[in-house]
């Protein structure tokens, strides 16, 4: 990353107390002279945090909620100005979702529900069902448009996302919308919980880092 002195980081939530690795990765890069712009799909939920997180929270730009005026206004402006490109973003999600890694085990269905309570069954479907995953991924199109425009306005040269699920789906779509290259760090559950879309996201990335096999 020697040539990337100005880059953005995207998190699903930031800061999160037990995810110290993301916090200290950003701190380490800043100490080495990188200009890091922080973005998060949602807030970290408050509560106690490491001392190093406090100044970074003030720097973090949180994506507006889906139904906010800022998000919907940006999305419908994009629909008016670039309708074909917006349509291609939705098509890219569906195409990537259909692609599976050869020989991958099927984690697209919820776990056996015989020992689960009703609430646990609902959560299992929400987190594991492939069709739910597709729906939640399609919802990221407006986020990618908003984020892509923000990154381009700020002159960001590269986007790095943590977790191979929704943050990387957003980065994948940002590249298609704004032409900004991305990389990502995958961890564990995000690789194995649902393997949909992963081949496309890996193929499009500048590089991938993972701590799991």
Regions found by a protein language model. Give the residues of each.
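Helix N-cap/beta->alpha junction signal
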Residues: 163, 211-213
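Short, well-ordered alpha-helical microsegments
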Residues: 18, 167-170, 192-195
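A conserved, positively charged/aromatic
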Residues: 131-132, 181-187, 192-206, 210
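A short acidic, amphipathic alpha-helical/loop segment
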Residues: 25, 170-174, 196-201
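N-terminal subdomain of nucleotide-sugar transferases
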Residues: 1-70, 152-154, 180, 207-211
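A conserved catalytic-core segment of Leloir-type glycosyltransferases
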Residues: 43-135
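An aromatic- and histidine-rich active-site surface loop
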Residues: 133-148, 156-177
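Histidine-centered beta-alpha loop that forms part of the nucleotide-sugar donor binding/catalytic region
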Residues: 11-12, 41, 164, 186-189
